[in-house]
Regions:
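Membrane-embedded, hydrophobic transmembrane alpha-helices
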Residues: 1-98
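Extracytoplasmic
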Residues: 12-18, 493-647
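Membrane-helix boundary/interfacial segments in multi-pass membrane proteins
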Residues: 57-64, 123-129, 236-249, 354-374, ...
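Active-site lumenal/periplasmic loops and adjacent helix-entry segments of GT-C-fold
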Residues: 109-252, 508-511, 516-519
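Short hydrophobic alpha-helices at membrane interfaces in multi-pass membrane enzymes
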Residues: 264-288
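Perimembrane helix-loop-helix junctions
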Residues: 301-332
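Hydrophobic, aromatic-rich transmembrane alpha-helices
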Residues: 309-310, 381-408
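Signature aromatic-anchored transmembrane alpha helix within multi-pass, membrane-resident enzymes
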Residues: 331-338, 401, 460-501
Length: 647
């Protein structure tokens, strides 16, 4: 696969996002930047929703069920708008002029993030050599094989008994669509998704959220774009650690959901004029796909939107009328109860929440202020802008400024708690919904700090501009002012790249480089996998240690594997087969199990595992029941030929 294949996959993903998500957003009545930010959110909701509904309708996974759902929702929305428009005349709203500064604010971070993604990937078909990627790459293959992308189905790949009843599958469903529509490999389709989410969805949502809270000023948009590309805890960290692709998708959609919540609650500085019913529909379109991308993003929405909800409650309680106040209190209590219940329902099991503390309380606070989460190098520009935002909040004391500061405090508090709070029960109460895992909270913190940083930049720019005499400003030609503004925007984005970003790119890049000593799949092992489709029949199942990377024969070579992930449900047959592979000897029971599961080939990728040395299958080379078919370096492919001799 070439870079042209990757560019084509990116183009296809952008096209279907614009056509499907954009058309529905247009039908709902969104325009301009709101339309641009809504398109990927609506596309995610429509795609993930269609994936759940399609099996009930007897439809296999493809663009067809997605298109059907989009036409239904868009058509009904457009029809309602026409009928309502005829019955109730609306006050015409003057159309907004094209804002060149928004375009610049989006183009600069998009270009920088594309560049950073390409640096990290290194090659169009590279893939992250990390533990979680075994599941994510194989999950896409499972969607393609079963023609089912439902979040109620993906868990069956590793838990055939149904014990994993729900696994957020929005990411895997979209990547599968890319494979279907373009014919590229799963790694190339995954990389196309990485680029679109990181350089497209994220900066658009970030700029929209900042403008919604801090106002539609050019400096707000420019600063938001610079910060979006300048704090590597999101999105780069989630490309490095894990990898956490589904959470990255969900958090990239989070700013739009927050902006919708702010607009719907009536505490926005800048938002479209929509009736309550349309706001509710837009909110549903925002949170559906985000939640099915990763529930952790929805819990983050609950946490970061709390200041807005409290502001609305306070405003309502100040109004006269005991009935209004009683309804407000009842609604707020219902909100709290629902939030607590959702936190418990969406919380992962206790065994998955055991991540340890990593910093002292003082160091954690300094890390949060410096924006140096995980990489321990300050994000200088963002840190300065946040401090300016705090200062201007204390000076201006406007409602919107307090909301941005409150959002920042919540994000910082969650991060400090997860890395430093030495009270286990209290720590788990606050951050257990995100596995008590520092990288997840660091990524959420970036969303929380971004509006305040943009506000700090814009308010400082306004103050500095006011210091320039009016006659001096008037003497500057318009073209010169625009050129100076563009230069300042480029400079800010460039300065935001100083500090943490280069280290983050360096660390993340190492996980995408395939070498002779790669943690998951070495260059020799990959070479053997590329020949697998010529040597292993489609009907056969391949056994191998998933910790050594053998499980990726499923995603990379399109051959079924006995263990598609390291954390797979082990039944009696799998247990017997794995035990036989460890010993290099298949008894009658193990042979029966192998025959029942169609296991006819074995990959031996040695004792180098993704998390360090593993036991491996050391006895395979001496087994009379296995015949060597192919080898590349230390990687070997065997055929199980001697089971008829057992028993």
């Amino acid at each position: 696969m070439t870079w042209l294949d990757l560019i084509g996959a990116v183009g296809v993903l952008l096209a279907i996002t614009a056509v499907i998500g954009g058309a529905v957003a247009w039908a709902v009545g969104l325009r301009g930047l709101w339309l641009l930010a809504a398109a990927p959110a609506f596309f995610a909701t429509i795609t993930a929703g269609a994936a759940v509904v399609a099996p009930w309708l007897g439809l296999g996974w493809s663009l067809l069920p997605v298109a059907i759902v989009a036409v239904l929702i868009g058509g009904v929305s457009a029809a309602i708008r026409v009928v309502v428009g005829r019955r109730r005349p609306r006050t015409p709203v003057p159309p907004r002029r094209f804002d060149i500064w928004v375009l610049i604010a989006l183009a600069l971070p998009a270009a920088v993030l594309v560049w950073r993604c390409v640096e990290i990937l290194g090659a169009p078909g590279s893939f992250s050599q990390t533990f979680d990627n075994i599941f994510h790459l194989n999950g896409v293959r499972y969607v393609l094989d079963t023609a089912n992308a439902s979040s109620l189905h993906l868990g069956f790949m590793t838990s055939p008994s149904g014990s994993l009843a729900f696994y957020p599958a929005a990411w895997h469903g979209v990547v599968a669509l890319i494979v279907q529509l373009t014919g590229v490999t799963i790694p190339v389709a995954t990389n196309a998704m990485i680029i679109v989410v990181s350089a497209g969805i994220w900066p658009v949502g970030a700029v929209l959220l900042a403008r919604t809270l801090a106002g539609a000023r050019p400096a707000v948009a420019i600063a938001a774009g610079a910060v979006a590309a300048g704090v590597p805890a999101f999105p780069i960290l989630l490309l490095d650690y894990g990898v956490l692709y589904p959470l990255m998708y969900g958090l990239a959609l989070l700013p739009f959901a927050l902006a919708v919540g702010v607009g719907m609650l009536g505490v926005a500085k800048d938002s479209p004029h929509l009736d309550a019913g349309w706001w509710i529909l837009v909110f549903a379109g925002a949170i559906g796909g985000m939640t099915l991308a990763h529930p952790g993003a929805f819990v983050a929405l609950l946490a970061l939107s709390a200041p807005m909800v409290c502001a609305v409650v306070v405003r309502a309680l100040r109004r006269r009328g005991w009935r209004r106040r009683a309804l407000t209190i009842a609604g707020f209590l219902s909100y709290l109860v629902a939030g607590v219940l959702l936190l418990k329902v969406l919380r992962p099991p206790l065994g998955a929440r055991g991540w340890p503390l990593s910093q002292s309380m003082g160091d954690a606070v300094l890390t949060a202020l410096a924006g140096s989460m995980w990489y321990q190098v300050p994000a200088y520009a963002a840190a300065v802008l946040v401090i300016l935002g705090i200062v201007w909040t204390l000076i201006d004391r406007t409602r919107e400024a307090w909301l941005m500061l409150a959002m920042y405090v919540i994000g910082a508090w969650l991060y400090v708690v997860v890395v430093a709070l030495p009270i286990p029960n209290l720590r788990d109460a606050f951050t257990g919904s995100w596995y008590n895992n520092a990288p997840r909270l660091a990524a959420i913190f970036v969303v929380a700090l971004l509006p305040l940083a943009a506000y700090g930049a814009a308010r400082t720019w306004t103050w500095l501009r006011a210091r320039i005499p009016a006659d001096t400003r008037q003497r500057v030609p318009r073209g010169g002012a625009i050129a100076a503004g563009v230069a300042a925007a480029v400079a800010l984005v460039a300065v935001a790249q100083i500090g943490a970003v280069p280290r983050a790119v360096e660390w993340a890049s190492s996980t995408y480089r395939m070498t002779a000593e790669s943690a998951l799949v070495s260059s020799d092992e990959y070479a053997l996998l590329t020949r697998l489709d010529e040597e292993v029949p489609e009907s056969a199942v391949v056994a191998g240690d998933p910790f050594a990377g053998a499980a990726l024969a499923y995603a990379l070579a399109d051959r079924r594997v006995l263990l598609p992930h390291a954390l797979v449900e082990m039944d009696d047959a799998r247990t017997r087969i794995v035990a036989a592979l460890r010993e290099g000897r298949f008894d009658a029971a193990a042979c029966r199990a192998a025959n029942e599961d169609d296991v006819r080939y074995v990959l031996d990728f040695g004792t180098a595992g993704v998390h360090g040395p593993i036991e491996g299958y050391s006895g395979l080379g001496d087994s009379s029941q296995l015949t060597l078919i192919d080898e590349q370096g230390d990687a070997r492919l065997y055929e199980l030929t001697g089971c008829s001799l057992a028993g």
